[in-house]
Curated annotation (Swiss-Prot):
NCBIfam families: transcriptional regulator NrdR (TIGR00244). Negatively regulates transcription of bacterial ribonucleotide reductase nrd genes and operons by binding to NrdR-boxes. Binds 1 zinc ion. Its cofactor is Zn(2+). PROSITE patterns: ATP_CONE. Pfam families: ATP-cone, Zn_ribbon_NrdR. InterPro entries: ATP-cone_dom, NrdR-like_N, RNR_NrdR-like. GO terms for molecular function: ATP binding; DNA binding; zinc ion binding. A zinc finger (unnamed) spans 3-34. This is Transcriptional repressor NrdR. One of its GO terms (biological process) is negative regulation of DNA-templated transcription. Residues 49-139 form the ATP-cone domain. Keywords: ATP-binding, DNA-binding, Metal-binding, Nucleotide-binding, Repressor, Transcription, Transcription regulation, Zinc, Zinc-finger.
Length: 150
């Protein structure tokens, strides 16, 4: 590993331990040239599929975009930050396990709505109202009636 202080290409590991529940390996390294120490973190590279937007564009999956959308839907609702993070974790796991290279944004939106439906129905309706872009109050009422039937 290249030294951040002198740029020498070789260093040795002097300490290594798991961090963040074993998802990351923290390593203390010492430069073989200047003897200064620095820390590196090693983690598995996540292979998440590309997200296919309605207009045909493809984007890398953005967890923060998902978390932000869920937070907006859950604003002033009794949903903890931990609950939101767990929903995002489950979504990422589902994306990794689906084994596809590309996933339509519509499918991701449906998965998020299913998560919200199980946690807070008001947040679910808020998210659905933005995600589904209801054209009028009648479409919105149909969604509410479907929710009440479940």
């Amino acid at each position: 590993m290249k030294c951040p202080f002198c740029g020498h290409p070789d260093s040795k590991v002097v300490d290594s331990r798991p961090d963040k529940g074993g998802a990351v390996i923290r390593r203390r390294r010492e430069c073989e040239e200047c003897a200064r120490r620095f820390t590196t973190y090693e983690r598995v590279e996540e292979m998440l599929p590309l997200v296919c937007k309605k207009d045909g564009r493809r984007e890398h999956f953005d967890r923060m975009k998902v978390v932000s959308g869920i937070k907006k839907a859950c604003e002033k609702r009794p949903v903890s930050v931990e609950d939101i993070e767990r929903m995002a974790d489950r979504l990422e796991t589902r994306l990794q396990e689906c084994g596809e290279r590309e996933v339509p944004a519509s499918r991701i939106g449906e998965w998020i709505m299913n998560e919200l439906h199980a946690v807070d129905q008001v947040a679910y309706v808020r998210f659905a109202s933005v995600y589904r872009s209801f054209k009028d109050i009648n479409e919105f009422m149909v969604e509410l009636q479907d929710l009440l039937k479940k």
